[in-house]
Amino acid sequence: MARYFRRRKFCRFTAEGVQEIDYKDIAVLKNYITESGKIVPSRITGTRAKYQRQLSRAIKRARYLALLPYTDQHR
């Protein structure tokens, strides 16, 4: 019987020593939204609660300023 090995999730922001997540850093923010534009939950990404709150706030600010789209496809 084969065992499934799941890689341990870790918080990238804690490992890098990030103090504040910047809403202008679109390359980082795009890693934490789905193709449809939803924010990926921390149980999937492994992000700590402190940084997940900063991340969601930064994504929402970037959306408001039209740096990120709200959805992928506008029809």
Swiss-Prot record:
**Superkingdom of the organism of origin:** Bacteria
Kindly indicate where the leader peptide sits in this chain. none
The family database entries (PROSITE patterns) matched by this protein are listed as: RIBOSOMAL_S18 (PS00057)
Q: Name its GO BP terms in alphabetical order.
A: translation
What Gene Ontology molecular-function terms does this entry list?
A: small ribosomal subunit rRNA binding; structural constituent of ribosome
| UniProt keywords, alphabetically | Ribonucleoprotein, Ribosomal protein, RNA-binding, rRNA-binding
Q: Does the keyword Ribosomal protein apply?
A: yes
GO cellular component terms, A-Z? cytosolic small ribosomal subunit
InterPro entries in UniProt = Ribosomal_bS18, Ribosomal_bS18_CS, Ribosomal_bS18_sf
Q: Which Gene3D superfamilies does this UniProt record tie to the protein?
A: Ribosomal protein S18 (4.10.640.10)
Write down a Pfam family by its short name.
Ribosomal_S18
Query: Assembly and partners?
Result: Part of the 30S ribosomal subunit. Forms a tight heterodimer with protein bS6.
The task this protein performs is described as: Binds as a heterodimer with protein bS6 to the central domain of the 16S rRNA, where it helps stabilize the platform of the 30S subunit.
Q: Which HAMAP family match?
A: Ribosomal_bS18 (MF_00270)
Q: Which family does it belong to?
A: Belongs to the bacterial ribosomal protein bS18 family.
This chain belongs to the protein called: Small ribosomal subunit protein bS18
Q: Which organism is it from?
A: Buchnera aphidicola subsp. Acyrthosiphon pisum (strain APS)
- Lineage, broadest ranks: Bacteria, Pseudomonadati, Pseudomonadota, Gammaproteobacteria, Enterobacterales
Designated gene of the protein: rpsR
